[in-house]
Regions:
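Mature extracellular or lumenal effector domains of secreted proteins
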Residues: 1-225
């Protein structure tokens, strides 16, 4: 076996046309392993401004491994979102007693909308780079709808650390036809309760994403205000 900086190759003695079988190191991709993989949805968009909302393979430098995650770069102008959890109604009971500050990784290597959650270290790293959190319903089938939806600043609702039962400030919240902007509403997350609001039954909001800001987007948002 021959090894270069970003790839390892095995000689194929029985194949005259293809003499080597080469694989890239986890951090690299491309035909010649010349491209460094993104470590976040934000970095993916920065590397390729034409990136669309879809599942990407990202590189985790802590564990030197790849994982799959859905990056949303298109649904809300000025935002790029990293999906940290998704589950169907059928699977909601499996998540009902799992607050975000406790580890419960599921299908990180083979993404599925019906049952997915990043590991606790990966969620914490994502949150530390981010400014907002949101929850949506049926995003994979209906795209973004502002019914059964909330968005808040992580400085107000830090889902990765908050053990809380009380009122918190939201930028926007809409639950079963009731909505308000820049207002307070109930938020609950306890050691054996998944994050939720009292306005709706646990499990009706089932897609949670964290926003990673890009400098040019923050500047646009300030000008619009």
């Amino acid at each position: 076996m021959r090894q270069w900086r970003h790839l390892a190759c095995t000689e194929l003695f029985e194949d005259a046309k293809n003499k080597f079988n080469c694989t890239c190191a986890a951090e690299y991709c491309g035909r010649f392993c010349q491209k460094r993989r993104a470590t976040s949805c934000k970095e993916q968009l920065q590397k390729n401004r034409g990136s669309r909302s879809r599942v990407y393979q990202l590189f985790d430098p802590t564990t030197i491994s790849l994982y799959e995650v859905f990056c949303d770069a298109n649904s809300e102008k000025g935002f790029v979102w990293t999906l940290i959890e998704s589950f169907s109604r059928r699977n909601k009971n499996e998540f009902a007693n799992k607050p975000f500050y406790k580890g419960y990784p599921i299908t990180q290597d083979s993404f599925t909308w019906s049952k997915f959650r990043l590991s606790l270290p990966r969620m914490i790293v994502t949150a530390n780079r981010s400014t907002h959190v949101r929850a949506t319903c049926n995003f994979n089938t209906e795209e973004l709808q502002y019914r059964d939806y909330f968005r808040a600043k992580l400085s107000e609702i830090d889902v990765m650390r908050l053990n809380f039962d009380g009122c918190k400030k939201y930028e926007f919240i809409s639950i079963r036809g009731y909505n308000c902007a820049n207002c307070t509403a109930h938020f609950v997350q306890r050691d054996f309760w998944h994050a939720h609001q009292y306005w709706f039954a646990l499990g009706s909001i089932d897609r949670v994403s964290i926003y990673q800001p890009i400098r040019r987007c923050r500047e646009v948002r300030r000008r619009r205000r």
